[in-house]
Amino acid sequence: MMRLKEKYNQSIKPALVKEFDIKNPMLIPVIEKVVISVGAGELAKDQKVLQNVADTISLIAGQKAVITKAKKSVAGFKVREGFPIGVMVTLRKENMYAFLDKLISIALPRVKDFRGLSRDGFDGRGNYNFGLDEQLMFPEVEYDKILRTHGMNISIVTTAQNDKQAQKLLELIGVPFTKGK
């Protein structure tokens, strides 16, 4: 599953150096980490469902997910301090490349009527965020073992100086963006 890392080292790095005229090799944009998170909302009230969500995210990521807890109480959301509110996992190195490879080559093509990811998900600092509506597009997830379908947020953190560099890096890796802009 190291296809993506080899592709990055052999063809993407030289292309980025050439396009952005980067003199210092330490300034070549690289993907630092990928964070997958699920805000449980109503699902958090049922511990069994929340554990099922954590298990599903662990299957998808290939690494154990952590149940996140509220840092402080918010009456408007009916949340108390220490109350479980979501699930997250941070992927780095080999797990990150394996997940991105699976996402780009297997999961996203399985989405019905998929036209590409929006280019609006860049944050101005070279990071990209997007959401997926359901977890069933991943091959590890079995429909029968799911208690409730849920979406997830995926954040790709890069060392790019700006959005233009980050977008080019992700395009070269193979992230399917929508046409235009």
From Swiss-Prot:
One GO BP: translation
Family, per entry: Belongs to the universal ribosomal protein uL5 family.
Subunit description: Part of the 50S ribosomal subunit; part of the 5S rRNA/L5/L18/L25 subcomplex. Contacts the 5S rRNA and the P site tRNA. Forms a bridge to the 30S subunit in the 70S ribosome.
Molecular function (Gene Ontology), one example: structural constituent of ribosome
Functional description taken from the UniProt entry: This is one of the proteins that bind and probably mediate the attachment of the 5S RNA into the large ribosomal subunit, where it forms part of the central protuberance. In the 70S ribosome it contacts protein S13 of the 30S subunit (bridge B1b), connecting the 2 subunits; this bridge is implicated in subunit movement. Contacts the P site tRNA; the 5S rRNA and some of its associated proteins might help stabilize positioning of ribosome-bound tRNAs.
PANTHER family: 60S RIBOSOMAL PROTEIN L11-RELATED
Pfam families hit by this protein: Ribosomal_L5, Ribosomal_L5_C
Organism: Campylobacter jejuni subsp. doylei (strain ATCC BAA-1458 / RM4099 / 269.97)
Keyword rRNA-binding: yes
Gene3D superfamilies: 3.30.1440.10
GO cellular component, one term: ribosome
Protein name listed in UniProt: Large ribosomal subunit protein uL5
Residue stretches spanning the membrane: none
Signal peptide (UniProt feature, chain positions): none
Key words of the record: Ribonucleoprotein, Ribosomal protein, RNA-binding, rRNA-binding, tRNA-binding
